[in-house]
Amino acid sequence: MTSELGIFYRSDFDRAWCDMSAETIKFTDSAAQRVSELLAEEGDQNLKLRVYVTGGGCSGFQYGFTFDEVVNEDDTVVEKNGVSVLVDPMSLQYLQGAEIDYTENVSGSQFVIRNPNATTTCGCGSSFSV
């Protein structure tokens, strides 16, 4: 079952949970393009980008990115331009309303999460608190 935003649901319970939260996760075109390029380099188009939140960093929580072949039963899957992003339920509560982007500028290039739930961030921007 798919919503108009490319979010896939495994059950009606998941749909109810995702309708209130996952549809507010934004995955930009530039992020999808960069992930697509990385997948081409890996040579495995079955990989998906997993975005997660874990404890750590100077502000209490930090973001993580990894490629994953396994879609867990309780994962939320967001698709954009043929790229799949996986978010586990624990991370989803911290990422509600967030935008996942990829930026390039004179300082370098990086994936950026703009998270409205983050009340403070560290100086380097790699950790946050809620």
From Swiss-Prot:
GO terms of biological process kind: iron-sulfur cluster assembly
Record keywords: Iron, Iron-sulfur, Metal-binding
Cofactors that this protein relies on: iron-sulfur cluster
An annotated Gene Ontology molecular function: 2 iron, 2 sulfur cluster binding
Free-text cofactor note: Binds 1 iron-sulfur cluster per subunit.
Amino acids binding iron-sulfur cluster: 58, 122, 124
Keyword Iron-sulfur recorded: yes
Regions that span the bilayer: none
Pfam families reported for this sequence: Fe-S_biosyn
Domain of life of the native organism: Bacteria
Keyword Metal-binding included in the entry's annotation: yes
HAMAP family: Fe_S_insert_ErpA
Quaternary organization: Homodimer.
NCBIfam families reported in the protein's UniProt record: iron-sulfur cluster assembly accessory protein, PRK13623.1
Homology family: Belongs to the HesB/IscA family.
Function noted in UniProt: Required for insertion of 4Fe-4S clusters for at least IspG.
Protein name: Iron-sulfur cluster insertion protein ErpA 2
Organism: Methylococcus capsulatus (strain ATCC 33009 / NCIMB 11132 / Bath)
